[in-house]
Amino acid sequence: MGRAFEYRRAAKEKRWDKMSKVFPKLAKAITLAAKDGGSEPDTNAKLRTAILNAKAQNMPKDNIDAAIKRASSKEGNLSEITYEGKANFGVLIIMECMTDNPTRTIANLKSYFNKTQGASIVPNGSLEFMFNRKSVFECLKNEVENLKLSLEDLEFALIDYGLEELEEVEDKIIIRGDYNSFKLLNEGFESLKLPILKASLQRIATTPIELNDEQMELTEKLLDRIEDDDDVVALYTNIE
């Protein structure tokens, strides 16, 4: 998704009640990471990243600890599922979910699409080739400066860890690499002792499209319904 869409999405997230919307999604990511790789962050890079992202959203330590403990309980019986859909104006949508009840999740998603004329869920794999999967890391520019590193120094240091692109956006530095380089890039940040502000695996459209304000307003109604579902932890579109 393009920067304009991300700006609107960021503005929407600020309006969310974190306890009711953001925290449950972050908790699911922590629980699944602990379930897959163990409850010790020192030996589980995926869990370290999930905790890092939770702390970036000011999630309380008690909530984080509870999410880790949940991995060994019946509540921790989560699975990762991806669904794909299409909407009007050529909009393509990929929804990454974490759920303990896939039947409930797909039923809810179908209801959102059914309420939107011209929108539909499509078979998995139909849209995969329209997106590139990337590892995306964010850090603060002043943290780089504190290490007495220039952007060129940082880029050179992380190339061997899988860096493909470095971008400066306001007070942040965004690092992108191949999807399979996520663990390696994480190790690169750790080797530099550079704090990570946020880390994620993202899907970036190969051919983004632009919508006018009216089209965007109509499309956002569907996207808002999807994002508000607790089982949906990430949403990607081809909107520029």
Swiss-Prot record:
Source organism (scientific name): Helicobacter pylori (strain ATCC 700392 / 26695) (Campylobacter pylori)
Entry-linked Pfam families: TACO1_YebC_N (PF20772), Transcrip_reg (PF01709)
Keyword Transcription regulation attached: yes
Keyword line: Cytoplasm, DNA-binding, Transcription, Transcription regulation
InterPro entries: Integrase-like_N, TACO1_YebC-like_2nd/3rd_dom, TACO1_YebC_N, Transcrip_reg_TACO1-like, Transcrip_reg_TACO1-like_dom3, YebC-like
SUPFAM superfamilies in the cross-refs: YebC-like
Protein name (Swiss-Prot/TrEMBL): Probable transcriptional regulatory protein HP_0162
GO molecular function: DNA binding
GO CC annotation: cytosol
Chief location: cytoplasm
Location in the cell: Cytoplasm
Family note: Belongs to the TACO1 family.
GO BP term, example: regulation of DNA-templated transcription
Protein origin, superkingdom: Bacteria
